[in-house]
């Protein structure tokens, strides 16, 4: 099932990409619509396919120390690789808080000074059992494809927890969609002359 939703945060993040030569990391799978969207913009797009690399049990139940040791192999980067935009989509909802905190730290280290992390946090009571596919229809519109009719309880992360899970980053803007998703664009606190939030 597919539905289109407004995404003003993504529109803003895309408009602020340096042109040409911006670097974008998509943590989701390779989708032709997203590749086709970024190609005319002269963007270097890297597809991590992170949700396919990590199984459900590992995302939620892996021992923290083992998870942190495995993470560089699950989400490898080239030396000096940096990104102007990271598309996390709804993946944060499918990791335990400890596991996602480690992922967020790894991503933050790779954001350029003016870079941004785009993410979608479920605020409704339930969510699809597995992450959705997201396709960029236009800069301010996302198509969400639900892959599973089965639902599970959503983590419903409050704003304070979202802050704690992304040390060093702040959200100068967020948007609550009618489909039960809070959209965040998180950027380096230093870029906004703000101190990092305590963890």
Predicted features and spans:
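Class I (Rossmann-like) S-adenosyl-L-methionine-dependent methyltransferase catalytic domain
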Residues: 1-17, 24, 31-77, 116-199
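Residues at alpha-helix caps and immediate loop-helix transition turns in enzyme cores, especially N-
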Residues: 34, 99-100
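Hydrophobic beta-strand segment of the Class I
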Residues: 86-87
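Hydrophobic adenine-recognition pocket in adenosine-nucleotide-binding enzymes
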Residues: 91
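A short glycine-rich, Lys/Arg-flanked "PGG" loop and its adjoining helix->strand segment in the class I
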Residues: 101-113
């Amino acid at each position: 099932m597919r539905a289109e939703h407004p995404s003003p945060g993504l529109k803003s993040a895309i408009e602020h990409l340096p042109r040409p030569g911006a670097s974008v990391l998509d943590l989701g799978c390779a989708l032709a619509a997203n590749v086709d969207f970024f190609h005319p913009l002269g963007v270097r797009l890297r597809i991590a396919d992170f949700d396919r690399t990590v199984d459900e049990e590992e995302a939620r139940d892996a021992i923290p120390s083992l998870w942190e040791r495995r993470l560089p192999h699950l989400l490898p980067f080239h030396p000096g690789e940096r990104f102007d935009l990271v598309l996390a989509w709804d993946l944060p909802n499918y990791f335990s808080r400890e596991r996602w905190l480690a992922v967020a730290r790894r991503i933050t280290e790779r954001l350029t000074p003016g870079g941004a992390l785009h993410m979608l946090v479920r605020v409704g009571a339930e969510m699809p059992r597995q992450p959705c596919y997201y396709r960029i229809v236009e800069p301010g519109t996302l198509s969400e494809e639900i892959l599973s009719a089965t639902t599970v309880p959503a983590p419903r992360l409050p704003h304070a927890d979202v802050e704690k899970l992304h040390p060093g980053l702040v959200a100068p803007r967020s948007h609550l969609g009618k489909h039960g998703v809070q959209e965040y664009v998180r950027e380096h606190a230093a870029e906004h002359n703000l101190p990092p939030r305590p963890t």
